[in-house]
């Protein structure tokens, strides 16, 4: 049957998976994450959640800020509690565009950068650099392990991220 079965699709977690802290001290609390299973079958029953798989992507999280983590490792209740929620706009866009509006999962290439958000930036970088963006996604983050195209693609993504960051900063008057 189609749809959400809470017994199957809601995955229990522990403090490592379901408790958010910004650092050793400060506001914190339990959290929930919403993931999308991008496997061809479309349902791995939560086995890929928080395993670093490109086929199971977190698109949304909710943090129920209700504690303060103290330097001695204890937690104090906060006088005011709130929910901090965040959705990955680029992640949602990449899933929608990469799966042809959730219709084709088998041949999907899901990357925040394989969207119409980044293509105009990559086009301009190609013109200015004389290099082509290949869309490779290296298995390793070790720069020494990358081939020439992977290194070029990483550089394109870094430049594009910096351009977007600067655009937002300029728009905010910074």
Regions found by a protein language model. Name each.
Residues 1-174:
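Structured aminoacyl-transfer and RNA-binding surfaces used for tRNA recognition/handling
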